[in-house]
Structure formats: C-alpha cells, structure tokens
Amino acid sequence: MSSTETYEPLLTRLHSDSQITERSSPEIEEFLRRRGSTVTPRWWLKLAVWESKLLWTLSGASIVVSVLNYMLSFVTVMFTGHLGSLQLAGASIATVGIQGLAYGIMLGMASAVQTVCGQAYGARQYSSMGIICQRAMVLHLAAAVFLTFLYWYSGPILKTMGQSVAIAHEGQIFARGMIPQIYAFALACPMQRFLQAQNIVNPLAYMSLGVFLLHTLLTWLVTNVLDFGLLGAALILSFSWWLLVAVNGMYILMSPNCKETWTGFSTRAFRGIWPYFKLTVASAVMLCLEIWYNQGLVIISGLLSNPTISLDAISICMYYLNWDMQFMLGLSAAISVRVSNELGAGNPRVAMLSVVVVNITTVLISSVLCVIVLVFRVGLSKAFTSDAEVIAAVSDLFPLLAVSIFLNGIQPILSGVAIGSGWQAVVAYVNLVTYYVIGLPIGCVLGFKTSLGVAGIWWGMIAGVILQTLTLIVLTLKTNWTSEVENAAQRVKTSATENQEMANAGV
C-alpha cells in the first residue's frame, strides 16, 4: 500500500471474459462520464455484474461478522429461554431494552469511523486512520462509564417503565452480568470499523466465527450442565466479547496489513477531538433512533395485559428480525465502505452505481426471506419455546415480521449510504420525526385503544419505517454525487491537516 502504487478502491481487477469486469474504478468512472445517458441496457447489466462482484467480495465477510456478533446474544437468549418463560422474558428485556440501548450508542458512534476512515482510505491518507480509531476508542470508553449506571440500576429503571417486578428482577440479574460487555463494545466497535474501512473483512469473519463457536459451547455448559442460570449466561456473554476484543486488537497490532494505517498509540488521539466528537454524536443519534425504535416495540409490549406472553412473543419475533437486520447491516457496512472509498477517490458515478446495485440486490433477498418466514413460522416459533400459548402468539405475528423483513431490505442500506456520505445529522432528524413523532404514537393508539394489542403497536411502527424509507429514497435520488466528492475531500483534508500539524509540533 505504498504511495507509489496506483490506487484502486477495493478489489478492482476481477478476472472475467467480459471486458467491463476487468476495469478499475477510475476506468469505470471515466466510462460513465464519457458515455453518460447513452449507456445501453446491455452495458448497464455488465456494470451491475462488475459492481456485484466487488460488493459481495466485501459484504460476504461483513455479513458473517455482523451476524456472528449478533448471534452471541441470540444464542445466549435461546439457552436462557429454556430455563423458563420468566427467565426468557427477563433476559429478553435486558438484552433488547438495556444492551440494545448501549449497543445502539456504541454502533452509532462507530459509524463515524466508517465515514472518516473510509474516505481517508479512498484518498490514501493512511496515517490518519489509526489516530481516528484511537479517538473513537477514547469517546467510546467515556460513554461506557456512563452506561454502567444504566446496567447496574436496570431493575428500578425497568419497573419505572412499567415492567412487572418479577421480569424487572430477572432482567437486572442478567444486565449486571453484562456490565463488562459494555467496555468490550467500546473497543470492539471502533476496531472492527477501522478494519472494514480498509476492506480487511475476511480475517474479521474468521475471528468472529472462532469466538462464536467457543461462546456456544461455554453457554451450553453454564446453563445446561453447571446450572449457573441467568447470571452465568450473562458473564459468558461478556467474556466472549472481551475475547473478540483481544483477537481483533492482536490482529491490528501484529498484521502487516495494518502497518501503514496503525502506527502505534499516540497522544494525538486526544487532540482535535471536538470536530470528530460532533460527527460521532450525529452518528450515534442517527443509528440509536433506528435501533431503539424496534427495542421500544418490545418494551411497550410489556405494558399490555398478560405481559409475559406478549413480551415473549414479540421478543422472539424481534430476534428473528434482528437476525435479518444483522444480515442487512453487513451489506450496509459494505455499501458504506464502497461509497466512502469511491467518494474519497473522486469517483461519484461509481458511488451512485454501487447504491443502485446494492438496493436491487437487497430487495430480491428480502423477498425470498419473507416467503421463508411465512412458510416455516410454526417451526421457527418452536426454536425458542415449548409453551403452546407463546408459539401460537408468535405464529400470529409472523405476517408482520415478513413486512418488516421486506422493509429491512431497503432502509438499512440507505442508512449505510448516508454513513458513507457523512449525512448522519440529516438522517437523525428524519428518524426522529418519522419514528417518534409519527410511528410510535400511531402504534400506541392502535395497541392500547383497539383490540389489536401487540400487532397494533407493530403496525404503527411499520408506518414510521415506511415514511422514513420514502424520505431516504427521495434524499438519495436528489443527491449531487459530484458535490459529495468535494465534501469528502474537504473532510479528509481537514483530518489530515490536523494530524500533520500535531506531528510537526511533536505531539
């Protein structure tokens, strides 16, 4: 990755019999610039194949990482669910309501790493990337300190939110066991985004797979053999996340792939932190408003009559929806890197091509997943519980799950485009209005003022997602990608200048 090498974003030399697929990103950019509106459908198809190969080379491993990270909590809840319906409700409310809030903050803050590091990588400003990652870690650890109090006092908080005493008690036990996990989040999220921005995704996938397999074995031992209950399961979850931090950190420190982007720890990470902090806040608000929206559905469901059944049913549906979300977040991370790399490299037309191809791809995938959910809904319900009443309640909600899965094929991808382009602040306002001013109130009215119950809450929230998705589509269609290249160049230039000034000053 020396400065003398010709830069080509991502994997740009793919072997194919088709001439177009042998071209680099700058060559494709020049082709699109010259041909413009005269590009024929035959050539658009070849361009789509070219982009799809790049996208899947990157997103395949990104999806594995995203899904396996989520599966750590998924497997934990599956094992605790067989301890009893009350334990399942407690673990679910702690995982969704408490851990989900913390993870939303950490993941949202880390999306700023994707924006700045991705654009810096595209512009070949490699030395600034390690400093950006360290700044992110500092801010994440500071946030983790404040979140610790949320975990420790989760019982009273859950009761204040209307959860029953029994569910709040079980949830507090589980949440306190996850306190070490918060600090693991604070380090793992920036490190993974730092590696993804450099297109280092296969090693991340291997590390995540190894940790997941060990986690599954340890969780089974703790819950089924040693009978350590909820607390034991939560502590194993925390341990697994720290193991993930350890292997990710060792890779960054020891791998030759990071020798130009990670030049060691530096006090420069503490300087010039304010501009990055502002982007971090916008990123956190944007993604948190999305993640908490679904978590709110679970929490509000606990306020209905017969809360244990309602909470178990919606929690199981949310776990499947979140599994699908992790799949789409893997694609979202890939498109974020694609867009940020291409904007940083000055290829606006290739960035736009990436956006179109990934959206067509995800809509097709979501359509297939909808059919699978509807056909196998009873079997999928039994994976979590043997309670006949809960199974029936879950099966009744699966049509709504199918609708949400289809929307997942569009909304997270457009959010990934926003992250790659640095639009976090704008999307944060969109999320606030469509989700919390419109969708959530409609859901509460339908859930509590009609006989629809939890289905009514979900329908209202689906309305919010539809409005948000339509807004993002309009925003994307109206984007001037040439201007976005200029914005990316200015963002990278500012970061690089700050780092160079501090280096010259001996900081």
From Swiss-Prot:
CDD domains: MATE_eukaryotic. Disruption phenotype: Pale brown seeds due to a strong reduction of proanthocyanidin deposition in vacuoles of endothelial cells. Belongs to the multi antimicrobial extrusion (MATE) (TC 2.A.66.1) family. Residues 84-92, 159-170, 224, 305-312, 377-389, 447-453 are vacuolar. The keyword Cell inner membrane does not apply. The chain crosses the membrane at residues 63-83, 93-113, 138-158, 171-191, 203-223, 225-245, 284-304, 313-333, 356-376, 390-410, 426-446, 454-474. The gene is DTX41. The keyword Translocase does not apply. Pathway: Secondary metabolite biosynthesis; flavonoid biosynthesis. GO terms for molecular function: polyspecific organic cation:proton antiporter activity; transmembrane transporter activity; xenobiotic transmembrane transporter activity. PANTHER family: MULTIDRUG RESISTANCE PROTEIN (PTHR11206). It is found in: Vacuole membrane. Residues 1-62, 114-137, 192-202, 246-283, 334-355, 411-425, 475-507 are cytoplasmic. Disulfide bonds: none annotated. GO terms for biological process: flavonoid biosynthetic process; maintenance of seed dormancy; proanthocyanidin biosynthetic process; xenobiotic detoxification by transmembrane export across the plasma membrane. This is Protein DETOXIFICATION 41. Acts as a flavonoid/H(+)-antiporter that control the vacuolar sequestration of flavonoids in the seed coat endothelium. Could transport the anthocyanin cyanidin-3-O-glucoside and epicatechin 3'-O-glucoside in vitro. Keywords: Antiport, Flavonoid biosynthesis, Membrane, Transmembrane, Transmembrane helix, Transport, Vacuole. GO terms for cellular component: plant-type vacuole membrane. Pfam families: MatE. Expressed in reproductive tissues, from buds to siliques. Restricted to the endothelium layer of the ovule and the seed coat. It is a multi-pass membrane protein. Induction: Positively regulated by the TT2-TT8-TTG1 complex.
